[in-house]
Amino acid sequence: MQKANPVSLRSSIIASGTLSTRFLVGFDTKATWGELVNGSILDCAPEELRGKCVLLATTDQFRASAALIVLDGIARRVVLFPPDVSLDHLAYVANTAEANVLVTDNAEAANAQHGIDQILMYSRTVTPVPVDRGEQLETEWILLTSGTTGQPKLAVHTLGSLADSAWETRPNAASIVWSTFYDMRRYGGLHIFLHAALTGTSLVVSSALEPVADFLLRAGAHGVTHISGTPSHWRRALMSPWAGRIAPEYIRMSGEIVDQAILNQVNAQYPYARIEHTFASTEAGVGFNVSDGLMGFPPEMLTRNPKIEMKIEDGTLKIRSTRTATRYLGSKSPALKDTSEFVDTGDTVELREGRYYFTGRRDGIINVGGFKVHPEEVEAVINRHPQVAMSLVKAKKSPITGALVVADVVLKPLNGEKEADALRSGILRFCSAELDAHKVPVAINLVPMLTIGESGKLVRRHA
């Protein structure tokens, strides 16, 4: 039986403050939070969805956000299907989540083979609906995360686990305008959406339809003061000639390892901003924020928050808190937590000179003749080269060592033309001075760009 819940997203937004002066701003539309909590974009009365499992498969962040405000507290379960996930997985996700309603603005998704009988298309506008919603249920929020078999894993959260860190902070919101490079169907973007919604601030959401330059211009025009993204998001933003069109007071980086190069570069571009990097994951939730301007984190960070238990075990960070997901859906899914209720993040760390440093993902190691190489460690060195904008280190198959290290490198715009061979040689010398021999790339490929997924992370393909 679905548990009653005195708090819903809608009621929490109402409690957060004045609703008529705060906005949710999309790519092509905007609305006040007041309009959103008293309206709906769904083509049915909200009560018709009571107790149902609703799968959101949309192309538009604004309308997905508006739907969540309606559905939390009414639906039994809401599944966020990110637009970058192939529709080939739609039937699997729908079946695993026991979805019986599909809400979409995508005709291809509506016509796909998914086994869902009730399909609702979005309205283009927010329509006022009756305020009395009846009893509020504790809705399960289902977030998709990558799986080793190719099928996504479905992590189960509640509003309480997702919003815990937002409820922890109540800033003076009058002058704050949040934004994020993330998509709100992913944990990083959803966290910022909830933070803005529950702390009384406006939010400008990004769109996959607009280039980085256009988003920066739009964010600047709306006076964004607080903004988040992955290190890859920020490297791409800094390559844009319009990076200076935003003047943030606060910058947050998360989702990937934050190296010293990107911290320094962002600080140089935005010297008046407070810069933090955050450890968070879909399964573990928000762990901690680091604000001292240095990569890595001090050991005391593991015990700073009494609500969050963290430990390093076998070189991997593990977390136990009320912010973690409860389980994965699906009878064949792995356990999300161990027997002590800790989430194994899969992120490896190393203690050096009194500070912990993230070294990479446990499942992303390159094996070079029996020696382990974390791609992120090599990238951190390459990214410190003064002429490098960003890099991607990967494995190349070798009949002798099993694998070799190679790197794709994007250069910063140069003042003068330099020979490609000279640049490659310079980067290799830079690596040789900093890394053990087996970690030095055997080849440097100069490329115009690197692929960044909708998650904001570099797309890594293992050899």
What spans do the regions from the language model cover?
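Conserved AMP-binding/adenylate-forming core of the ANL superfamily
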Residues: Q2, S11, G17-E48, L90-A91, ...
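Conserved AMP-binding A3 loop
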Residues: T32, E140-W167
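Conserved AMP-binding/adenylate-forming
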Residues: L42-D84, T180-D183, K372, L411
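Conserved AMP-binding/adenylation subdomain of ANL enzymes
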Residues: A163-V177, R185-H226
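Gly/Ser/Thr-rich phosphate-binding loop
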Residues: H226, L238-F297
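AMP-binding/adenylate-forming catalytic core of the ANL superfamily
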Residues: I227, E341, G346-K439
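Conserved ATP/PPi-binding loop(s) of AMP-dependent carboxylate-activating enzymes
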Residues: K311-E341, F371-V373
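AMP-binding/adenylate-forming catalytic domain of the ANL superfamily
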Residues: L435-K457
